[in-house]
């Protein structure tokens, strides 16, 4: 068929392009072809428009293989618009596809006469549809993809030598959303041949990564989008973290996240999990490989998660699967015994075969054999094992409380962590012993059968362990509290006896012990019996005199009570009118009396009488009566926590057999002491030994044997009260501080009831335990007042400052419970001031003169009014007007029960001490200052010297400037601790009050 008008014959160049069609290759890996014309034999079935545009040409290449192309070459005519449309292509789920076009294009310059009409480009279009539209498509429906130009074009010379210049262009199409699409080529005047068209989309291939299988995934709609794909763990594996990968637009897997690990019993091998072989195991999922079974174990099947122990071997419940299987130990060896009376010490060596374990302990089995070793029975609960009978760690044991002349068999078993798993009997070492002769045990039960005026009949039970035939009983008796002077004994052959020849109306103490051929046992507990009183026989005159005497005594007693009630103003404040009671309770009625804070219910101390150790004729008798001797070997000193002139105070532990060590404080007398120093030192222990109260330091015992001299007391973790408060400045509530004072007051009430005068009550002599319980301590020796006006009462342990002592005790050396009350008021001030030194930096001489002139310490910062009023009452000049300790405790109890009464704080209204005013500079001198204290001295006096630089940097060079400071000024100096702010402001407030009242009248209390 002749060529159309304006067209060049295509056969001239189709033949040269035939070889190019054969170069079409299959889709690359990761690419899925939707259309590939190189695989179509014959006509492609595409539509052309108009009819004289594109031509379908079927030729053969040089290999005589058929080849089909679409060609157009209407270069002679202008305004060409020739369309070539593909068949409908299903999308197959792809969001974006790629068109790979292979074509040839002739150079316009190689054709004469076509410069105005020849083009070297063509356009590519696409149209989406959900079905095949047939031939009913319109040009306007298509969307342009791109204008395509050839990288290389051929000329007439190329045709002559059959040289092919093939162009390959790839364009992306999308995003697509409908079921299929068409591609269309628009020719606008080029000499062009389409050799092949491949339409494909990209996908990420299926793969296994990190033991997770990822299925193939189609790329996203955009060239930059990533499609997330979640993997599935391969067989016998489990997720460690969720496995995910991202499929890129180029069909490549990116960014692996998470992974799977092989399950227990399986290990990874070439992207798969394979079972552990026989003899191997894996106990937990993970990356680790299967491990060989530990010693003495095996795996029964592949994929073992644990190895089973061999016969007679075991694994304890807490042993990991990786541990070797072990077995019970063999018996201990070299078991030896050492008999001492009715006790035996057993020692042995560890077993030769520990069974592969190190957790070996020992159990002791005791069997008593009265008749023969073949007929034994359990020893019973009375036998004592030290340290214990089972779970022994050390290879030694003491067995006590055995019967005398008795055969025993002891079995020592060695056990370890798998002994309970073995059905076999435990292996033990055996030793047989016979106890020696021993004295009988203590007589436990003794009771009074009858008591007359001059005789007492007693009845008791035989000892639980007679340890032989009891030959007789010995009864020891004496008048109460006269054992050291004389006592008597009586023999009896039965468990009953009558003691005669006693004094009528006298209290006697009786003790009984048994005797065998081995000796005497211990005496029983003491039992007190009072003999009957004789019947009095009086005549009428005697009876009349007795009645008159009783009546006179009652009258005198009544007068004394009336006198006491009128003169004891403090008692009236508590017992008369409600108006007086409001003085301490802010208008609230006092609460009923309740148990002390530090006593458990129903356990109040029993009243007794204090005995002065120096009144004993024999100095050592007081120590034996009131103290307990402790063996020095039971005390282990760990560190020194204090020292003084007479000795050192140490922290240590007291070993108690069968119990935990007790932490104690040990006061040891220094070497080189005299006998008088030793006697005075131990006299303090004799004093402490008489006290039993939860707010009095408890004496554990003394060490007096040999050259050692030590006093052992309970250990108080927080040390002295003054140091403790200074360390925790501002950290307690008012209620907590009142609770501490209540504890000190309760202890002093107890001492006062006993008739004991402390003479040195101060915060430094009050100790605090871990529960904030305060206990009175330091029961020192006699004190001597020197003639020096600055003197302090001295003891061998040091000086007692004047500022804690009552005026009458300083002036007349008169110490009483009332002088202790004065000291308690100072302790109250110390507690509320958090360990502040009373009277600051005043000398002892100034303190004495100021107190005599009526000065009293002002209320500390934030001190409730009720507490400061109680201090002032304790500092009453007339000691008869001071409260008793029982009344002080009642006031503190009332304040604790009525917290609202502690809200009103006291204001500083007392006059300053004249000595203090004289020692200071003229505060009214402004910033110029005077000739006395500096700002640094003032800060040192209130223990705030650390802030010297702060005040200097703030420009406060004199106390005159300091007096004008407020809370904001103090904070501006960088003082952030609330307790320190309160202390500084409180001192400033005190100085202001002292300044304003310096010229005012003084009054005595």
Swiss-Prot record:
Task: PTM Phosphotyrosine: list the residues.
Answer: 616, 839
Domain annotation Eph LBD: ranges = 31-209
**Segments on the Extracellular face:** 28-542
Q: Where in this chain does the record put each Protein kinase domain?
A: 635-896
Q: What protein family is recorded?
A: Belongs to the protein kinase superfamily. Tyr protein kinase family. Ephrin receptor subfamily.
Subunit comment for this entry? Answer: Heterotetramer upon binding of the ligand. The heterotetramer is composed of an ephrin dimer and a receptor dimer. Oligomerization is probably required to induce biological responses. May also form heterodimers with other ephrin receptors. Interacts with FYN; possible downstream effector of EPHA8 in regulation of cell adhesion. Interacts with PIK3CG; regulates integrin-mediated cell adhesion to substrate. Interacts with TIAM1; regulates clathrin-mediated endocytosis of EPHA8. Interacts with ANKS1A and ANKS1B; EPHA8 kinase activity-independent but stimulated by EPHA8 ubiquitination.
What name does this protein carry?
Ephrin type-A receptor 8
Organism from which the protein derives: Homo sapiens
- What taxonomic ancestry is recorded? Eukaryota, Metazoa, Chordata, Craniata, Vertebrata
């Amino acid at each position: 068929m002749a060529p159309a008008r304006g067209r060049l014959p295509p056969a001239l160049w189709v033949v040269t392009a035939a070889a190019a069609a054969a170069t079409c290759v299959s889709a690359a890996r990761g690419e899925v072809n939707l259309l590939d014309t190189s695989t179509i034999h014959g006509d492609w079935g595409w539509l052309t428009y108009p009819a004289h545009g594109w031509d379908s040409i079927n030729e053969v290449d040089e290999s005589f293989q058929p080849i089909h192309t679409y060609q157009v070459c209407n270069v002679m005519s202008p305004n060409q618009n020739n369309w070539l449309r593909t068949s409908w292509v299903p999308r197959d789920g792809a969001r974006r596809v790629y068109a790979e076009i292979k074509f040839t294009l002739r150079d316009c310059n190689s054709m004469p006469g076509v410069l105005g009409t020849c083009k070297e480009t063509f356009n590519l279009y696409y149209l989406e549809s959900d079905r095949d539209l047939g031939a009913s498509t319109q040009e306007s429906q298509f969307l342009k993809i791109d204008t395509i130009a050839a990288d290389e074009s051929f000329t007439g010379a190329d045709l002559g030598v059959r040289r092919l210049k093939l162009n390959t262009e790839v364009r992306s199409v999308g995003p697509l959303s409908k079921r299929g699409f068409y591609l269309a080529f628009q020719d606008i005047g080029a000499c062009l041949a389409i050799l092949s068209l491949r339409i494909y989309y990209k996908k990420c291939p299926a793969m296994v990564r990190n033991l997770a299988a990822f299925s193939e995934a189609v790329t996203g709609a955009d060239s930059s989008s990533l499609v997330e794909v979640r993997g599935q763990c391969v067989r016998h594996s489990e997720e460690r973290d969720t496995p995910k990968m991202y499929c890129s637009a180029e069909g490549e897997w990116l960014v692996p996240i998470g992974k799977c690990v092989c399950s227990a019993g399986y290990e990874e091998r070439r992207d798969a999990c394979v079972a552990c072989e026989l003899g191997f195991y894996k106990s937990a999922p993970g990356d680790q490989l299967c491990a060989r079974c530990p010693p003495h174990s095996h795996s029964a099947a592949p994929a073992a998660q644990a190895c089973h122990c061999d016969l007679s071997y075991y694994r304890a419940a807490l042993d990991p699967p990786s541990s070797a299987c072990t077995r019970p130990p063999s018996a201990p060896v070299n078991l030896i015994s050492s008999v001492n009376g009715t006790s035996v010490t057993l020692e042995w060596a560890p077993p030769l075969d520990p069974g592969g374990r190190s957790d070996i302990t020992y159990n002791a089995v005791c069997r008593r054999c009265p008749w023969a070793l073949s007929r034994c029975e359990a020893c019973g609960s009375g036998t004592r094992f030290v340290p214990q009978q089972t779970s022994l760690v050390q290879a030694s044991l003491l067995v006590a409380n055995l019967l005398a002349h008795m055969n025993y068999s002891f079995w020592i078993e060695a056990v370890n962590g798998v002994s309970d798993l073995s059905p076999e009997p435990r292996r033990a070492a055996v030793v047989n012993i016979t106890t020696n002769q021993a004295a009988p045990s203590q007589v436990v039960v003794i009771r009074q059968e009858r008591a007359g005026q001059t005789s007492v009949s007693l009845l008791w039970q035989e000892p639980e362990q007679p340890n032989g035939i009891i030959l007789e009983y010995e009864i020891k008796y004496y008048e109460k509290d006269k054992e050291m002077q004389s006592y008597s004994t009586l023999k009896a052959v039965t468990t009953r006896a009558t003691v005669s020849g006693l004094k009528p109306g006298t209290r006697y103490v009786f003790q009984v012990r048994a005797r065998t051929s081995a000796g005497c046992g211990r005496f029983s507990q003491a039992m007190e019996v009072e003999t009957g009183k004789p019947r009095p026989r009086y005549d009428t005159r005697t009876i009349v005199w007795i009645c008159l005497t009783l009546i006179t005594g009652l009258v005198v007693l009544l007068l004394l009570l009336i006198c006491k009630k009128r003169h004891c103003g403090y008692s009236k404040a508590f017992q008369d009118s409600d108006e007086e009671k409001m003085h301490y309770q802010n208008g609230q009625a006092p609460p009923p009396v309740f148990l002390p804070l530090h006593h458990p219910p129903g356990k109040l101390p029993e009243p007794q009488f204090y005995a002065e150790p120096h009144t004993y004729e024999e100095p050592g008798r007081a120590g034996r009566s009131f103290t307990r001797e402790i063996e020095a070997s039971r005390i282990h000193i760990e560190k020194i926590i204090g020292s003084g002139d007479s000795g050192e105070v140490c922290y240590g532990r007291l070993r108690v057999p069968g119990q935990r060590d007790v932490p104690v404080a040990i006061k040891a007398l220094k070497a080189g002491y005299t006998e008088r120093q030793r006697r005075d030192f131990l006299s303090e222990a004799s004093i402490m030994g008489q006290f039993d109260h939860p707010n009095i330091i408890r004496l554990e015992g003394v060490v007096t044997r040999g050259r050692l001299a030590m006093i052992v007391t309970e250990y108080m973790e927080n040390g002295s009260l003054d140091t403790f408060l200074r360390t925790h400045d501002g950290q307690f509530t008012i209620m907590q501080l009142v609770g501490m004072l209540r504890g000190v007051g309760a202890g002093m009430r107890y001492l006062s009831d006993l008739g004991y005068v402390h003479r040195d009550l101060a915060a430094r002599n009050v100790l605090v335990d871990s529960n904030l319980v305060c206990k009175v301590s330091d029961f020192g020796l006699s004190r001597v007042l020197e003639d020096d006006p600055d003197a302090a009462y001295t003891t061998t342990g040091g000086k007692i400052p004047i500022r804690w002592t009552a005026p009458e005790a300083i002036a007349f050396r008169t110490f009483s419970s009332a002088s202790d009350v004065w000291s308690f008021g100072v302790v109250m001030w110390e507690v509320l001031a958090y360990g502040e030194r009373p009277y600051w930096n005043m000398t002892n001489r100034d303190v004495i003169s100021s107190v005599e002139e009526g000065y009293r310490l002002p209320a500390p910062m934030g001190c409730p009014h009720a507490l400061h009023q109680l201090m002032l009452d304790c500092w009453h000049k007339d000691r008869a007007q001071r409260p008793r300790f029982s009344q002080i405790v009642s006031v503190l109890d009332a304040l604790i029960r009525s917290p609202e009464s502690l809200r009103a704080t006291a204001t500083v209204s007392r006059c300053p001490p004249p000595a203090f005013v004289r020692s200071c500079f003229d505060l009214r001198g402004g910033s110029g200052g005077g000739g006395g204290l500096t700002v640094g001295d003032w800060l040192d006096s209130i223990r705030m010297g650390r802030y010297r630089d702060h005040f200097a940097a703030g420009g406060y060079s004199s106390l005159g400037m300091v007096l004008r400071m407020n809370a904001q000024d103090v904070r501006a100096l960088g003082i952030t601790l609330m307790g320190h702010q309160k202390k500084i402001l409180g001192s400033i407030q005190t100085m202001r009050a002292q300044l304003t009242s310096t010229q005012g009248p003084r009054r005595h209390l």
